[in-house]
From Swiss-Prot:
Pfam families reported in the protein's UniProt record: Cypovirus_WIV_4 (PF23018)
The protein's name in its UniProt record: Non-structural protein 3
InterPro entries referenced in this protein's UniProt entry, alphabetically: Cypovirus_WIV
Organism: Lymantria dispar cypovirus 1 (isolate Rao) (LdCPV-1)
Region described as Disordered: spans on this chain: 229-253
Length: 390
């Protein structure tokens, strides 16, 4: 039985330090091998743990980390830990971008190539510093095992040679990378600063309560209907909004329903509307989600030192698309000093005319997303960008 592993090379900037590796496995493959060993039970990563908790999970015997949806990343200390004490991260589906999404590269290292390897059970146990589970054996079998220990050890070491049977991933699956050089100086006019106008958010006012309902009284003395308006004692509870008025027909509880003195009447019950969510609060949550997705994909490009813009604005861009992946189109500016990375979902959410009304909200959201990364937010005409601080 073999298992497919993905091996991400971690390259040190110091040439005197050896390369490191981190390993990934897809969820379907982990389900197959999980019953083989108690240590294959995964350590659950919720996104808010720290290195000492991961170390405790390792000491308890866990050798796999669950991070199915890639919603959170191991911090640099935890990534360094699994580089030195191998633990395999379980993901739903592996792509060449997965290591960037689920781990944080420690300072002094960079991501290298990704390779795919089919491992036998023995190779997998050896990689994770584990031994096979003991089984009930006869005395003869025990003696045979002791005699063959040395030969088996050499055989396993030979089969664990990663230099053979390496399968390179197809080029179309590899992530496109735009290689740019770091400029000596960026012209001030290229950044196109613009004055920021703070636009007060438009808030939907909650509807006022309707007047007290009209209570219909029926008299047995006369067939005429009397309308009595009574004061509202208790405000109606907040109900689900309905576009149609609710009509309720009331009938008196008399024994003789055929009496000519009985009149049926309709009472209109008002339905109160729930207060609408403020527009700014709603848009802020949408922008945070979109910009976080853009920022995670752009971070390696931002580290190269050029300003990266999110929308074209009034900057002159080369019309030819440099690189296109499934979600983002890349352009170079005519001057060659700036980069435009257009994400389709952001372009749909922020039309140029609307950007002027929301520029302060967008700027604050970008600053929140970039916080802690030593990155400036650049404001231009109908666009925003980011630049790594020197």
């Amino acid at each position: 039985m073999t298992t497919k592993l993905f091996k991400q090379t971690i390259i040190p900037t110091n040439k005197d330090v050896d390369e490191k590796y981190i390993y990934f496995i897809e969820r379907a493959d982990h389900k197959t091998i999980k019953p083989l060993h108690p240590s294959f039970e995964s350590w659950q990563f919720a996104g808010n743990q720290h290195a000492h908790q991961l170390e405790q999970g390792y000491s308890e015997g866990h050798r796999f980390i669950t991070n199915y949806n890639a919603t959170s990343r191991l911090n640099s200390a935890m990534t360094l830990q699994i580089m030195n004490k191998p633990m395999i991260t379980i993901v739903k589906k592996f792509t060449t971008n997965t290591p960037h999404q689920v781990t944080t590269i420690p300072e002094g290292y960079s991501f290298g190539v990704v390779k795919e390897k089919l491992c036998t059970n023995e190779q997998l146990l050896s990689l994770l510093s584990l031994t096979a589970e003991p089984t009930a054996e006869s005395d003869e079998e025990v003696n045979d095992v002791s005699r063959d220990d040395e030969a088996e050890k050499k055989d396993v070491e030979a089969r664990m040679d990663w230099s053979e049977d390496i399968i390179e991933l197809p080029k179309q699956q590899q992530e496109s990378v735009l290689v740019v050089s770091k400029p000596n100086m960026i012209a001030e006019e290229e950044l196109m600063p613009a004055d920021i106008e703070v636009v007060a958010p438009r808030v939907l006012e909650p509807p006022t309560l309707s007047p007290a309902p009209i209570v219909v009284a029926v008299s047995s003395e006369s067939p005429q209907v009397k309308e009595i308006e009574r004061p509202l004692t208790n405000a109606p509870k907040e109900q689900r909004t309905s576009r149609k008025s609710v009509t309720r027909t009331t009938k008196p509880s008399f024994s003789s329903l055929s009496s000519p003195d009985i009149v049926s009447a309709s009472v209109i019950t008002p339905v109160s509307k729930a207060a609408a969510r403020p527009v700014e609060e709603f848009l802020s949550s949408v922008f945070v989600s979109l910009f976080e997705a853009w920022f995670v994909r752009m971070l390696p490009l931002i580290k190269l030192g050029k300003p990266v813009y999110i929308m074209p604005g009034t900057i002159k861009w080369d019309k030819e698309v440099q690189i296109t992946d499934t979600k983002i189109r890349y352009y170079n500016s005519v001057s060659g000093r700036l980069i435009l990375a257009e994400m389709e979902s952001i372009t749909r959410a922020l039309q140029p005319g609307e950007l002027e009304d929301r520029k302060e909200l967008v700027r604050r959201t970008l600053e929140t997303v970039c916080a802690g990364n030593n990155i400036y937010v650049l404001t231009g005409n109908d666009t925003f960008g980011v630049l790594e601080a020197e």
